[in-house]
């Protein structure tokens, strides 16, 4: 019963950290990344279609993304979709391929992005702590119902705290790595 609680707690915390890692891939760092275009949708024959389902996306240089639509007639719509996504990128087209140059970030913008990343990481720490609280509440109700003793409750809460500390450290590591990537010139 307690082991199931540990497993559920750990599983929920793993999901939180994975979600954070996925969110961090979307943060612009001054380097080109395929994930920068993840949210781009293109009006393709009246249907909003994800860009990655209608074009080849490549990164030929560290500050450039190329987008080659499979249907050349849709190139103008792809450009509009990138602009409408409002991700701070400006596409330029030669009629066959779209090139997106990633402008270098200013020092102020880098600090601003780092601050946003820090706030996001703090939100995920709160989420992990809420999972801990849920687990501790479950343990308290088990003790109240007489399913576990006070000693078992104390040991289990300590184990839940250890699991929480482990995941908080993972979140801090994700933040440190992303901050280094952002502030690096």
Swiss-Prot record:
InterPro entries for the chain: Ribosome_recyc_fac (IPR002661), Ribosome_recyc_fac_dom (IPR023584), RRF_sf (IPR036191)
GO CC annotation, single: cytosol
An example Gene Ontology molecular-function term: ribosomal large subunit binding
GO biological process: cytoplasmic translational termination
UniProt keyword annotation of Repressor present: no
Chief place where the protein resides: cytoplasm
Keyword Protein biosynthesis: yes
Alphabetical UniProt keywords: Cytoplasm, Protein biosynthesis
Localisation per UniProt entry: Cytoplasm
Family indicated by similarity: Belongs to the RRF family.
NCBIfam families referenced in this protein's UniProt entry, alphabetically: frr
PANTHER family: MITOCHONDRIAL RIBOSOME RECYCLING FACTOR PSEUDO 1 (PTHR20982:SF3), RIBOSOME RECYCLING FACTOR (PTHR20982)
Function: Responsible for the release of ribosomes from messenger RNA at the termination of protein biosynthesis. May increase the efficiency of translation by recycling ribosomes from one round of translation to another.
Name this protein carries in UniProt: Ribosome-recycling factor
